[in-house]
């Protein structure tokens, strides 16, 4: 059986853990060659061994550094050819009341959650366009936004603002690059149980927040598999500028 993203060259940022790791596993299982990028190289190397060295490449990269982003794409192209599928997953949160959060902390959240998304997407689009229309029409860029970009969550103003910006940036880039055939969409998860969120979800704040949601539960890491595969596949050729919310009704609390 041919995988749903067979023949694609996919780049996943923030792939060393959590959702990024899951996204890489999902794309690889469906036939894509996958470039996994993050700052923690030892974790990436372990993931490459798991997925298979013939079809996976690890690249250590700080996506807030433009030069490192360019080098990441250079390495990907040297190994697999033009990257036609990008999952812009690298991101962070910072739980602190706005009155006590300093400007450096705010900027750090914005730099990783917004600026890096723009930088990676721009580099991908530049190379797709340069490769010609047959390549660019296959372009799929999926920016990982969040339910938090649509609602107010006390104590994470910077994170909420950054994810709202990510979603709007997605629409703007989709409009700019539509004529090249490049599709740009956002995927907005709700509360997902991962290595990074486990402590918070099991703590007092997370338990209280989940208790207010209609179904009073968190989502598993595999909850986003189908939405991700659709947005990265040829089936989504007419879908661009969308923000796909997968949150189990959590934002309706």
Model-derived features: where do they sit?
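Alpha-helical segment proximal to the catalytic Tyr-Lys
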Residues: 126, 175-176, 237
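Short, small/polar-rich loop/turn modules that mediate ligand/substrate recognition or access, typified
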Residues: 178, 183, 239-241
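Active-site helix of classical SDR
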Residues: 121, 162, 170
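Residue(s) in the substrate-gating loop at a strand-loop-helix junction
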Residues: 146
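Substrate-binding pocket helix/loop in short-chain dehydrogenase/reductase
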Residues: 97-98, 102-108, 197, 209
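Short C-terminal tail/terminal secondary-structure segment
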Residues: 4, 151, 229, 240-253
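Conserved glycine-rich cofactor-binding loop
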Residues: 16-17
